[in-house]
Amino acid sequence: AQQKGMPHSTLFIAHSEATRRNIERLFRPELDLGVISMDGAMSLQTLKVTTLNTYCAEVLNTEISETEFLDRDAFESKQTQLLYTLEALQESLSNELPTHKEFMSKGFLDYLNSEDHWVIAEMLQHEISVKIKGRAEEDEAKYYKLPRLRYGLPVENEGDRVFAFLAFRNYRRRLENSGQFDTDDIVLSALGQLNTPIWRRRRAREGFDSIFIDETHLFNLNELSVFHRITKSDHLFPIVYSADVSQSLGDRGWDDETFDEAMGGSDQAGNSQPTVFKSIFRCSPEIVDLAFSVTSSGATLFTNFHDPVAAAN
């Protein structure tokens, strides 16, 4: 675009504020030289580096105040969500389970009784985000009709779903009491704003020519649904994303095919061009040497360390 003297707007999405600052630092030399600019004043080629939370807040404009965010950082926000979900789960296990267990499946009851509460809370958080909020729009009747996710909470019958929805209500009450909105509330509200006649008219002018997404595996399906609505074109999606599907923290069961479908629809999935990295670029040789030294030492590494507790005694 620069060689042709054509305008080009790029959006670079990071998952957390720390990552955003690091990415912006990498582009700082080009920004200082005026090769690209943040606002279009110095160059026709513009770059916007931000987090999805911040971008969605800009879309919502003045409809949400700073104090209503769980946290501006998506990672911290999701950790707070998990704590609220754990509290809601424990309340439901204590108050609702005794009266509802006779209507619930044996498999789901065994899961609730045998699995660690933190693990169940993570699965419930995913159920709330993707199914109850994302697909059912917090409608109880719609949720009961939805099929179980392949990698989701192991609900088998309507009684299981009733219990999960009661846990969601306990979670929602905690958000209401604190006067805050979680990441999914903000993203889904922004999606509503991006599906209006006003945005469809403005899209060709205010959308992005290209979008780059870092650590895509950390985003859930609700969050990924935003990106194909903010490109200039509504049928071509010039999106570049990096993903480590072995982590799959944002959503359960991510693989290469489901990523392609989420980032452009099944009709666009065949047009993607994957690049598989077999080398590790994150670690410098010094860090690799240190890691090798630690693993080679085994348990003997810790035998010569000073014990401050023993000295205190």
What residues fall within each predicted segment?
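Conserved helicase motor core of SF1/SF2 NTP-dependent helicases
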Residues: P7-S9, H15-E30, G34-S37, T50-C56, ...
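Conserved P-loop NTPase motor core of helicases/translocases
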Residues: F27-P29, V35-E91, S189
